[in-house]
Amino acid sequence: KIAEQKAGIIKPHTSVVSAKQEPEAEAVIKNACLERDCSLQFVDPAQITDVQYGIARQSFSYKGWKQMEISLAGSYQIINAALALEGVMALRALGWRLTDEQVRSGLLATKWRGRFTVIGEHPTVIMDGAHNPAAAQTLKDSLERYFPDRKLHFIFGMFKDKDYHEVIRLTAPLAEDIVTVETPDNPRALPAQELAEAVYPVNPHVRAAKTVEEAVGEVLDEAKEGCEHIY
């Protein structure tokens, strides 16, 4: 269903690029391109090489592009950057003049707030907007890759119309402890206490905060007590 919705933006007689998808979603995109007479190119994960992961900067090579650097953290951002390069190659094929230096500087300068974004240090504070199982799996993968031996403190809020039980199943076991919050002034927000009760069977080290400010203060104090705490 999501693939069908996203394929709806495809315009006839255009060039389409996409990250690698699950077979069912890939078939939807292929059919949409066939119906609208579009060329289609998927990212080839096998051609992503020389990957160097890092919080401040990451690098990789893809096809003819060597040692490309990005400032975005998160293992999935390498895939996103490779997709951007596929877009560049498609534009060049259409006659757009994009120099290698423009592409390199553009990738390095790109920011994406709310996607595994470091917003504080000592302790490291990471903000991520994962709100569905797929995004939660990606967050889990990134936390395990970048902080395999670090203690994690979570401040956690969800909307009640999302599959928060699956998000909890994927991410809650990673946390040393979890403070749940309710998004203020939003009718879709899941109450902090209700969210804490949902978390408890997966990770009993959970408590509900009255406000986001209270949660941030508590968790920062806890994280500063040790030198290896991330939240």
Residue ranges of predicted features:
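C-terminal lobe/tail of nucleotide-utilizing enzymes
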Residues: 23, 47-89, 213-230
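A generic secondary-structure signal
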Residues: 5-8, 90, 142-146, 170, ...
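Short, surface-exposed connector motifs at secondary-structure boundaries
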Residues: 7-16, 146-152, 174-177, 222-227
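Hydrophobic aliphatic residue packing
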Residues: 2, 9-10, 16-17, 125, ...
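C-terminal helical cap/extension that packs against the catalytic core
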Residues: 22-41, 56, 124-127, 133, ...
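Beta-strand->loop->alpha-helix junctions that form or flank phosphate-binding loops
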Residues: 19-23, 34-54, 71-75, 102-109, ...
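Acidic, Mg2+-coordinating active-site environments of NTP-dependent enzymes
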Residues: 1-64, 85-104
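Nucleotide phosphate-binding/pyrophosphate-handling subdomain across enzymes
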Residues: 1, 64-177
